[in-house]
Amino acid sequence: MRINPTTSGPGVSTLEKKKSGRIAQIIGPVLDVTFPPGKMPNIYNALVVKGRDTGGQEINVTCEVQQLLGNNRVRAVAMSATDGLTRGMEVIDTGAPLSVPVGGATLGRIFNVLGEPVDELGPVDTRTTSPIHRSAPAFIQLDTKLSIFETGIKVVDLLAPYRRGGKIGLFGGAGVGKTVLIMELINNIAKAHGGVSVFGGVGERTREGNDLYMEMKESGVINEQNIAESKVALVYGQMNEPPGARMRVGLTALTMAEYFRDVNKQNVLLFIDNIFRFVQAGSEVSALLGRMPSAVGYQPTLSTEMGSLQERITSTKAGSITSIQAVYVPADDLTDPAPATTFAHLDATTVLSRGLAAKGIYPAVDPLDSTSTMLQPGIVGDEHYETAQRVKETLQRYKELQDIISILGLDELSEEDRLTVARARKIERFLSQPFFVAEVFTGSPGKYVGLAETIRGFKLILSGELDGLPEQAFYLVGTIDEATAKAANLEMESDLKK
């Protein structure tokens, strides 16, 4: 972390003596720059190109040094469009990596990869900045205590609980609800834990980023009247940005989260949507730098790049960063090198199912595919563990019986199997839940359900005490008491119709 004596623009540190070079070659977003002998910049240094294009428009492009080519040449990747750049333009070496503003000034604001505000709400206090390239915390600083991070979402807390300071992968194809689940988590964490969140939009749609910002303002996570009371900082590098920006925007978001953890000693939630786009941008840059591709055309440095990002996301004795990362799965193939490399770093996986989304069960979390290293009796306790296992057994049995049901019908099943199917269908519906951020779509007020209440509800269904209630009573409710109240209302409505 650096305290800047001046309030110079973010992204570039203030230096008295600056070395300068000239552009020798431009290949799309990659620049080759020639420097005088003995004045070469270091790897990862930020270079700034300032000048005017042929039309007289001002140019200000920041690049990051990636390779030293020899003969006093370096190869750098641009963080913004290189339109208008020409050979021979002056390039200034800032003498330090990209630095971005950190701390309370970032809350409620939207930044780009350079830490520049892009929300038209005026300048940001840049007296405190931090470089985006840092080493991971030392072993001695790490906190190894295992504790559950309660989200208030029943299916997550019961079947695939999140670890405080852990890394969670949100797997799903296009349009099954990854972003809605992320928005609900930001909302719940802000309200229930009072913690701050940092959202890194890596290579996703500009429209989604805009929708997220608007919904955060509506739900109060971003406070427009008093911006300092906001609970989230947003960092965007959308699909239309050059690959350099998409590759580094995750590090910008992580740097902001690290400050809240290390200096403010807070528990932080870091969202990365989408980690696959980080890999994809790295692959593009790797090809532009002339590296030989590896499996399926990915960069040969895939594991190293992923590791250098993921190892910085951890709990220390000062605070924790719990990270939730949306993982796009290309062609729904989990063996693709990008999702497969991500898997190795995760403590829990929340898998979203297109089949459940088609049934209208939201959140469409697959209860049998989602996993967590925290679901052990020694960590969550015997009651929670046994309830979760029985729920999974019931759902698994229902899945096995579905072929028989579709061919022969329910009547051909034994009495015991029919009971299992009835309970499984109730469980499946009870795993759905109305979200605060989806109130406008569902018309139902959002619900936050505590872990103890979640366990009690599923134990009652499994025990058979609620066998007499209709299964639609369990759909889109919070606690089990709401389900029984809904059943009574349904019964009253049917009596009135008679």
From Swiss-Prot:
Upper lineage is: Eukaryota, Viridiplantae, Streptophyta, Embryophyta, Tracheophyta
Q: What does this protein do?
A: Produces ATP from ADP in the presence of a proton gradient across the membrane. The catalytic sites are hosted primarily by the beta subunits.
EC number, UniProt record: 7.1.2.2
Which controlled-vocabulary keywords does the entry list?
A: ATP synthesis, ATP-binding, CF(1), Chloroplast, Hydrogen ion transport, Ion transport, Membrane, Nucleotide-binding, Plastid, Thylakoid, Translocase, Transport
**Subcellular localization, as worded in the UniProt entry:** Plastid, Chloroplast thylakoid membrane
Q: Name one GO molecular function term.
A: ATP binding
Q: Which reaction does it catalyse?
A: ATP + H2O + 4 H(+)(in) = ADP + phosphate + 5 H(+)(out)
Superkingdom of origin organism: Eukaryota
Listed GO biological process terms? proton motive force-driven mitochondrial ATP synthesis
Q: How does it sit in the membrane?
A: Peripheral membrane protein
Main localisation, per the record? plastid
Q: What does the entry list as the binding residues for ATP? A: G172, G173, A174, G175, V176, G177, K178, T179
Return the similarity comment: Belongs to the ATPase alpha/beta chains family.
Q: Among its keywords, does the record have Nucleotide-binding?
A: yes
Check the record and name the Gene3D superfamilies matching this protein.
2.40.10.170, Bovine Mitochondrial F1-atpase, Atp Synthase Beta Chain, Chain D, domain 3, P-loop containing nucleotide triphosphate hydrolases
Q: Name one GO cellular component term.
A: chloroplast thylakoid membrane
Q: Which InterPro entries does the entry link to? A: AAA+_ATPase, ATP-synt_VA_C, ATP_synth_F1_bsu, ATPase_a/bsu_AS, ATPase_alpha/beta_chains, ATPase_F1/V1/A1_a/bsu_N, ATPase_F1/V1/A1_a/bsu_N_sf, ATPase_F1/V1/A1_a/bsu_nucl-bd
UniProt name for this protein: ATP synthase subunit beta, chloroplastic
This protein's assembly is summarised as: F-type ATPases have 2 components, CF(1) - the catalytic core - and CF(0) - the membrane proton channel. CF(1) has five subunits: alpha(3), beta(3), gamma(1), delta(1), epsilon(1). CF(0) has four main subunits: a(1), b(1), b'(1) and c(9-12).
